[in-house]
Structures are given as structure tokens and as C-alpha cells.
Amino acid sequence: MPENSNIPFSSVFLEKNPPIDAHIDEILQWCKKLYGFSSNPVMEGNLSFRTGMGFIITGSSLMLNNVTKDTVVEVRGVVFGLNRPSIYTKGQTAPSEEALLHSVIYEAFPEINAIFFLTSHNIIEAAEKSGIPSIDTNRPAGSQELAREVANLFKSNNNTGPLIIKNRGVIALGKTISEAAQLTEEIQKKLESGVRVKSGKK
């Protein structure tokens, strides 16, 4: 598969077979659920969880409802070169362009085992109204610089609750997949509640 030129790193495929892990089914279930939540589907995003070799993340340029066992990738290492980083993977496709963000967070927070990053104007709006901390940055999407800024903000907030990356999305961390999912669901429910109020529904 040709590599997306917009991805800010090079993918080095150690193995072309898709990764195998018991938690993949759980991630796929959440991809479908978050995409189809009420009347406000989250169209895109990237979900990951830590493994013994690194972490498994959804593939590049995928709608959440299109993620399958063949389009998740295990990131096993990152090497920062002179031009751009190289990410060493097991799988059939390149990892999400935010793979560096996930990698830096996992390195900074050993207790974190799952990351949900959802991109949708509606979910950002709902998160902002909820008073969730935010970061407004001009750093390129998927860059090492952005990843470090986000990790630093999580550190300053004692790694509690989700975080908004303005004009991009909402990121939630969890010690488990369920914990990251629960934080995301809470924002989605607030979004749904807001829609009902605006439309006059109860």
C-alpha cells in the first residue's frame, strides 16, 4: 500500500501480518460505537492500547466505522532521524498520522494503557462547553513537537480527564480501554444533551 505523503513519518514494516491481541475486538467495538453514537457520529479519530511490544493503533486515514482487524497496526518502535521519524510496525497499513502523539504519551505516562483521540467539530464544541482544558497550537498535526506539547499539558493537569487540541480533536487517556472510553462517552452524552436542548426535544 503506498504511504500517504501527509503522514509526518516513514513506516518501516517489520511484518506485514496484522497484529493479534485479545483487546483488538474491544477497540473495534468502540470504533463502531463512537462512530454511530446518537445523531452525532464521530467521523474520524485514532484509538490505541498498550501492548508488551509497544502499542496497537488504528490505521491511517480511516473512518472509525471502517476500522477492521486488518487495518490496525502494532507500533514497535520509533527512531527520530535527521529528516523525519521512522516508525517500526507490524501490520498491513501505515499507522494513524497521530502515532507519534500516542507514542510520546505512552512513554511519558507508564500507567496509561489506552488513548482515544476523536476528531469532530461537534465533539470539540461539547468538550469546550464542559470546561475541559485545551491547547491552542500551530504545531503540525502528527508532529513530535505537538506530541510533546500535549504530553506537557497532561502533566500540568496531573493527567486527569480529557484534553482538547483546538481545531483538531479531543484526547482521553485511560489506565484501561474502558476508562478511556468512559471519558469519551461522557463528552458524547453532553453533546447529545445539547442537541436535544437546541431542538426542543426532551
Annotated model-derived regions:
Residues M1-K202:
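Glycine-rich flexible loops
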